[in-house]
């Protein structure tokens, strides 16, 4: 490693994160940085918050400082020490890299030894020097972002406080409280299943004991299973639409293109996206919406490395107390904006708006997605009557106009919402979905589809069978003359309208 002259900080340099970080874990020179299992797929990083946990006993001998020095962002005796920024830089690098995935985000109740667990992803052989890789570099691009952020505040879209009085359009949600079995309850906060925090206690002088606990959590279930199913799953899903995760929504938060949090919610009524310390209560339904909604808090901006970006992001989060409701009604998805912060969006039901900014009016129910419309367009696409597959992704932009000429990655706060059932159906017919046991998390939803939707699924199933005649594979069970009360999972008319 070449060193610059004394007193002159080295310029930002390209560093291949995966080999560097794996080597640091193997070196065992940083306290607490260690492999979780013998396969060296999961590793543990102590993740202290200086403002909440005080200074570390190990001083500045951390992997965060080492990364800052390796990337040329910190030089001993020249730059002022900034542990918070070092930590944010490494987290951003991990989030941007395709070689790592956050597996477990540690307990949420401020434990004495907070930590994260990352997974090393298998992306084939390591790239050579001439091949593209997920290098991490800091330089001119971030400096340009700083200048752009400095001019941003006057253009942030924040409304004046709403005047007292009834909302423009009333909204209501189903009152029934659906109970889900614990085994089917999805984690809130991460895409992969989250192990029990009580079993994932941080090591305290006994790393061996910590490793003995983890396999008991990690081995069972879909993460450890890689055997392909003995029968094709797709025909069963189309025969029995209630096997599709109709209430599942994938939600991805992004702060200027960096994703601090991705999660899946399965509440049959929907969710509320908000940022506040105030809890929704039954007595404050008019302020925060029904308490039966999944309450999803925006990620903290504390790990944003840029001071200016963090400042402006906080300006918007401060007026997101009441939040944005995503309401599931029948087979449609709606948005109800309660917050003072303006919200703009794009999605399947907004195509007519083109590239012009598309705001969500405050306290007015706005239709975002229709499963019936998606199924009709999917059938037309599969028959070759349309050239493009039906869209299903929904994007929200908070406090800035969208769509416009500015790319989404440059917006302060964006949220992507994906109806999981639509994504699965499209992937089934495009051949993009790998039907291994760990590729789909099946859930049973209430069979509340309308009668004509059953006909749409039967037509999709017929198209699927036609495709399979072109290639040899295990045949699905015969479905001739099938009606809604037949098949391996019979559909009953309970709940249909």
Curated annotation (Swiss-Prot):
Homodimer, when phosphorylated. Interacts with TASL (via pLxIS motif); interaction takes place downstream of TLR7, TLR8 or TLR9, leading to its activation. Interacts with MYD88 and TRAF6. It comes from Mus musculus (Mouse). It comes from the Eukaryota. Its main location: cytoplasm. GO terms for biological process: cellular response to muramyl dipeptide; cellular response to peptidoglycan; cellular response to virus; cytokine-mediated signaling pathway; defense response to virus; inflammatory response; innate immune response; nucleotide-binding oligomerization domain containing 2 signaling pathway. The gene is Irf5. The keyword Transmembrane does not apply. One of its GO terms (molecular function) is DNA-binding transcription activator activity, RNA polymerase II-specific. Residues 137-148 have a biased composition (Acidic residues). The keyword Oxidoreductase does not apply. Residues 124-178 are annotated as: Disordered. Transcription factor that plays a critical role in innate immunity by activating expression of type I interferon (IFN) IFNA and INFB and inflammatory cytokines downstream of endolysosomal toll-like receptors TLR7, TLR8 and TLR9. Regulates the transcription of type I IFN genes (IFN-alpha and IFN-beta) and IFN-stimulated genes (ISG) by binding to an interferon-stimulated response element (ISRE) in their promoters. Can efficiently activate both the IFN-beta (IFNB) and the IFN-alpha (IFNA) genes and mediate their induction downstream of the TLR-activated, MyD88-dependent pathway. The modification Phosphoserine is found at residues 157, 300, 430, 434, 436, 439, 445. PROSITE patterns: IRF_1 (PS00601), IRF_2 (PS51507). It is found in: Cytoplasm; Nucleus. Belongs to the IRF family. Keywords: Antiviral defense, Cytoplasm, DNA-binding, Immunity, Inflammatory response, Innate immunity, Isopeptide bond, Nucleus, Phosphoprotein, Transcription, Transcription regulation, Ubl conjugation. A motif (Nuclear export signal) lies at residues 149-159. This is Interferon regulatory factor 5. InterPro entries: Interferon_reg_fac_CS (IPR019817), Interferon_reg_fact_DNA-bd_dom (IPR001346), Interferon_reg_factor-3 (IPR019471), SMAD-like_dom_sf (IPR017855), SMAD_FHA_dom_sf (IPR008984), WH-like_DNA-bd_sf (IPR036388), WH_DNA-bd_sf (IPR036390). Maintained as a monomer in an autoinhibited state. Phosphorylation and activation follow the following steps: innate adapter protein TASL recruits IRF5, thereby licensing IRF5 for phosphorylation by IKBKB. Phosphorylated IRF5 dissociates from the adapter proteins, dimerizes, and then enters the nucleus to induce IFNs.
